[in-house]
UniProtKB/Swiss-Prot annotation:
Homodimer. It is found in: Cytoplasm. PANTHER family: GLUTAMATE-1-SEMIALDEHYDE 2,1-AMINOMUTASE, GLUTAMATE-1-SEMIALDEHYDE 2,1-AMINOMUTASE 1, CHLOROPLASTIC-RELATED. Belongs to the class-III pyridoxal-phosphate-dependent aminotransferase family. HemL subfamily. GO terms for biological process: chlorophyll biosynthetic process; protoporphyrinogen IX biosynthetic process. This is Glutamate-1-semialdehyde 2,1-aminomutase.
Length: 438
């Protein structure tokens, strides 16, 4: 059978288009987060109606195999029946207490048991909030102001982090954001990912001034970029030598590439860790944690102030507890890894069969590819990917019932709900789509 042409007429999205058209008069760009607007892939965004397991349905009734998973939280599959059941029971007791609840203890114990660096943890409501709070904490603990981040790494939309950031900033081609004072970013130093020499130079140029180094241990907001052997270990040594703290932003990798996150997978323990996504089971959540002596600086135990109305709310705690219980079941990560490895290998093979330059990889339940020759070791090399062709690919995959992240600079996610049949169908869809756009 000849490949289906990549045309809008092959997929009825009239209701999505009508809803999005109305949304543009109500919300900036018609969305609540920029990447959802399909700016980098073209066309109208798909408006979802419901999700279940590995699938999403739009308001026009089209069904997709979903590889975004709500941007990472849905590692057990959307609307897992055990998570839904636990939430139904919890919601009868109230949606938010604004007071301590025992569920916080339970989830905190699970996080501390799982994540090597975490001796104490504070729950917040988003990854951005976790990273913002962590930044204040490392400055308070060290008495220093400067930080080092890496080009293409995204740590939320707080002012200090919007310097050579990834995620939506990379998608829109913006180096930073209007409204961020130069005085705020003057203390943010940047280095290319996987470049230890640049980090050494920054420490040499800023003696006794750098509070910490923060990074995504696997970059998922500038595509999918893995640390080269020795990079994370080198950062651990450099921070210790210079009296700075090492922070892993595991909002994306936490509980996704292994139960203990990237730090357990790679065997490198930072001083502090930020988390989100998976630990809330699909509800808004964030967390930061680390060594007890550092965390005890957080109010009310210490002087560093941070608070939140909905932090530790019983619904997010309930969903997080049940999700981690499901992930602890024997064989969960073996299944996730095998599923993801088979998927990415099929994608790479399909691209090469079509004569396209392609490179990529996976770790645990996280994967990504670039439409360029590899390897891709940093954000500058990632920018060589063919974004125009990716836009065509994205549309072609929608036509074939597969929902990918609407950006060439975002990682993809699998779940326990993705079956062998889902993977087979997805690989065939890639074959057909690559053939259609090559």
């Amino acid at each position: 059978m000849a490949p289906v042409p990549v045309t809008a007429s092959n997929l009825n999205t009239s209701h999505s288009e009508a809803i999005f058209s109305a949304a543009k008069a109500l919300m900036p760009g018609g969305v609540s987060s920029p990447v959802r607007a399909f700016k980098s892939v073209g066309g109208q965004p798909i408006v979802f109606d419901r999700v279940k397991g590995p699938y999403a349905w739009d308001v026009d009734g089209n069904k997709y195999v979903d590889y975004i998973g709500s941007w990472g939280p849905a590692i057990c599959g959307h609307a897992h029946p055990e998570v839904i059941s636990a939430l139904q029971e919890a919601i009868e007791k109230g949606t938010s207490f604004g007071a301590p609840c025992a569920l916080e203890n339970t989830l905190a114990e699970m996080v501390i048991e799982a994540v090597p660096s975490v001796e104490m943890v504070r729950f917040v409501n988003s990854g951005t909030e976790a990273c913002m709070s962590m930044l204040r904490l490392i400055r308070a603990f060290t008495g220093r102001d400067k930080i080092i981040k890496f080009e293409g790494c995204y740590h939320g939309h707080a002012d200090m982090f919007l310097v050579k950031a990834g995620s939506g900033v990379a998608t829109l081609g913006l180096p930073d954001s209007p409204g961020v004072p130069r005085s705020t970013t003057a203390n943010t130093l940047t280095a290319p990912y996987n470049d230890l020499e640049s980090v050494k130079q920054l420490f040499a140029e800023n003696p006794d001034a750098i509070a910490g180094v923060i990074l995504e241990p696997i970059v998922g907001n500038a595509g999918f970029i893995q640390p080269e052997p020795g990079f994370l270990e080198g950062l651990r040594e450099l921070t210790k030598e210079n009296g700075a703290l090492l922070v892993f932003d595991e909002v994306m990798t936490g509980f996704r590439i292994s139960y203990g996150g990237a730090q357990a997978h790679f065997g490198v323990t930072p001083d502090l860790t930020t988390m989100g996504k998976v630990i809330g089971g699909g509800l808004p959540v964030g967390a930061y944690g680390g060594r007890k002596e550092i965390m005890e600086m957080v109010a009310p135990a210490g002087p560093m102030y941070q608070a939140g109305t909905l932090s530790g709310n019983p619904l997010a705690m309930t969903a997080g507890i049940k999700t981690l219980e499901l992930l602890k079941q024997p064989g969960s990560y073996e299944k996730l890894t095998a599923t993801t490895e088979r998927l990415i290998q099929g994608i790479l093979d399909a691209g090469r069969e079509a004569g396209l330059p392609i490179t990529g990889g996976s770790v645990g339940a996280m994967f990504g590819f670039f439409l360029c020759e590899g390897p891709v070791r940093n954000f500058e090399e990632a920018k060589a990917t063919d974004s125009v062709r990716f836009g065509l690919l994205h549309r072609a995959m929608l036509e074939r019932g597969v929902y990918l992240a609407p950006s060439a600079f975002e990682a993809g996610f699998t779940s326990l709900a993705h079956s062998d049949e889902n993977i087979d169908a997805t690989i065939q869809a890639f074959r057909d789509s690559f053939a259609a756009i090559s």
